[in-house]
From Swiss-Prot:
Residues that bind NAD(+): 11-14, 160-168, 292
Keyword Oxidoreductase: yes
Keyword terms, alphabetized: Aromatic hydrocarbons catabolism, NAD, Oxidoreductase
Leading EC class: oxidoreductase
Catalysed conversion reaction: acetaldehyde + NAD(+) + CoA = acetyl-CoA + NADH + H(+)
Similarity section: Belongs to the acetaldehyde dehydrogenase family.
Database matches in InterPro entries: Acetaldehyde_dehydrogenase, Acetylaldehyde_DH_C, NAD(P)-bd_dom_sf, Semialdehyde_DH_NAD-bd
Name of the protein in its database record: Acetaldehyde dehydrogenase 1
UniProt record, GO biological process: catabolic process
The protein's Enzyme Commission number: 1.2.1.10
Amino acid sequence: MTRTKVAIIGSGNIGTDLMIKVLRTSKHLEMGAMVGIDPASDGLARAGRFGVPTTAEGVEGLVALPGFDDIEIVFDATSAGAHVVNAARLLPLGKRLIDLTPAALGPFTIPAVNLEDHLEAPNLNMVTCGGQATIPIVAAISRVVPVEYAEIVASIASRSAGPGTRANIDEFTETTSSAIVEVGGATRGKAIIILNPAEPPLIMRDTVFALVTAADPDVHEQIRASVDKMVADVAAYVPGYRLKQAVQVTEIPADQPVHTLLAPDAERPTHQVSVFLEVEGAAHYLPAYAGNLDIMTSAALQVAERIAAGKADR
């Protein structure tokens, strides 16, 4: 079987973890290039030891590589600003882009929710690590009952956040909030990220709060079942993804001012759904606490595998 050649731009934590996943676990992909801007980066050094072609000259260095024409898919693991430049250079050359930054030039893509809708898109955006972990849960609740407001809190180990992640903090909240609405189906959404400085580093933890109208106990059970199914769907490509405890559906007290979170014309919801998750990494590059890397790179790999498999089927 002929494998699809891919390149990764960004030799930091995310790009390096993704490279190792492609090399060790991919069924349909082959590393064609690892691209960075720091000649001394660990990611480029590792790529060189693995025999992967490398360049420290950024996107122009990629285009200049002898094997560039054979590369079909390019993962961008840089920053939101850099992705704008990279996309402008690569899309006219016919490369498919999988964007692991919050730039969101292409459609938001969550494999367990809407991958099949975007397989032909030239540039797919992977939202954010927090989005990959929590938006499937919002979507699962939305499949049962309308979600007037959804709020997610992503807590990641500070040590797992490299310079690219830190540079994108504002874009993280904006992009994730938008995707909660666009992909998750909530009327309104908010995202909060916490870089936890605790030592030893703690595993990625995510919390989803959703405000719904669901007075019927049978609906509560439908919500729990939908969330359980979605967790299993995500865990199929992120094995360390799991519920921390049972889904909670609680009545909203009459004196709680939830109207401040809702659209002006929204009816007051009756219940809050609370979902608590944790994501343990596969430790391909960083230790297992870096589940935020693992869910992002695993989701991106799932997208590329599906694109490559679809090409092979045609």
